[in-house]
Amino acid sequence: MTTDTIVAQATAPGRGGVGIIRVSGKLASDVAHTLLGHLPKPRYADFCDFKAADGSVIDQGIALFFKGPNSFTGEDVLELQGHGGQVVMDMLIRAVLKVKGVRIARPGEFSEQAFMNDKLDLTQAEAIADLIDATSEQAAKSALHSLQGEFSTQVHTLVDKITNLRLYVEAAIDFPDEEVDFLSDGKIAAALYAIIDQLDEVQASAKQGSIIREGMKVVIAGRPNAGKSSLLNALAGKESAIVTDIAGTTRDVLREHIHLDGMPLHIIDTAGLRDTTDEVERIGIERAWSEIASADRVLFMVDGTDTAAVDPHEIWPDFIDRLPKAMGVTVVRNKADLTGEPLEATEEQGYSVYRISAKTGLGVDALKQHLKSLMGYQSNLEGGFIARRRHLEALEQASEHLQLGKVQLEVYLAGELLAEELRMAQQALSEITGEFTSDDLLGKIFSSFCIGK
């Protein structure tokens, strides 16, 4: 951990009513004496002049001093809140750097110091960047929940339960004559199943939090001339794709990035799926299947004039059978303006079914609301936390180890192997909060932050 004293502008560069310079480290008090002529009373606002080394006044404003460990970074912190002109900010930073031993902060270094000094765990530190980068009110609220420790608390609860179970199993190993009875009495199995169920719930919430942060990938798929490109245009609100009556017009993947009430949505229009001898169209169809395989949701576009069926297994069983097992599918019956069917949403055989006219826009707003709900949009903004892809990967690793541990318990009654799988699951979860994390990962995370944060 560095013992350097660091300085950076904490507010965004450019013109503004207020600009803030932040200093953190053991030399923060020396900086105060140099620029202010005194050390402000800790945690009290002090209106004073900010002076250069020659005594000339650079600016005047509010000085705040926080004595470590009672500060954001856990170190002594000085904040100078002056006028927001960039020239003034640069002059103040140069004056601070004249104090020997002070250097410019790296991106995210203030948050990194807070993490190193146990003021924040890693998910809370990441939540600061996510709160700053939030593109919707929902994302901001979820990031704030993570900053307040909601995600961390759930992870810590799981780690504690896994640790206690592991100790219980290891106690059984220490008494080999009783180990088999100990492992087969049902108590360990019940505790393990409860942990697996709880982890499943956290995984579901984390996946929703990841969608709120990164957006949901929605692929529009179906047979040629079902109206896929028309739906892309309707959702995007512009003519992104060429629309004709000729089957196979779309031969490549088309992408649009839109926001629904600020929530990011990545829409992919694909080539119509069919057998073809046209080489270019065939390549487009292969790309379509590749996009479908990595989608968060598939909009199965159906030409309502071709069939009255609503069950996708009845409409096109081969298509549904080829989809990844856990893929979410929404059936979109298009051309309701021609079929005259009511513009209603129904649930059929576990699938959401929407009736629309991509050409006229009828029913498209209801489909947008459906997509918003899938992304976790909540009008009351209650609950939920933000999550990153690395969090999902760590949760999946923990889940895999718990499932392997379940096999060791149920099939082999192997206490040592169960204990090892529990240890690996515990380690995977601890990577989320930073209790077990490599320096390379820390560097990658904090380097993506703003300077001054």
UniProtKB/Swiss-Prot annotation:
Binding positions (K(+)): N225, T244, I246, T249
Residues given in the record as (6S)-5-formyl-5,6,7,8-tetrahydrofolate binding sites: R22, E79, K119, K453
Superkingdom of origin: Bacteria
InterPro entries: G_TrmE (IPR031168), GTP-bd (IPR006073), GTP-bd_TrmE_N (IPR018948), GTPase_MnmE (IPR004520), MnmE_dom2 (IPR027368), MnmE_helical (IPR025867), P-loop_NTPase (IPR027417), Small_GTP-bd (IPR005225)
Location in or out of the cell: Cytoplasm
UniProt cofactor note: Binds 1 potassium ion per subunit.
Protein's GO biological process: tRNA methylation; tRNA wobble uridine modification
Signal peptide: none
Official protein name in the record: tRNA modification GTPase MnmE
Species of the source: Shewanella amazonensis (strain ATCC BAA-1098 / SB2B)
Biological classification of the source: Bacteria, Pseudomonadati, Pseudomonadota, Gammaproteobacteria, Alteromonadales
Gene: mnmE
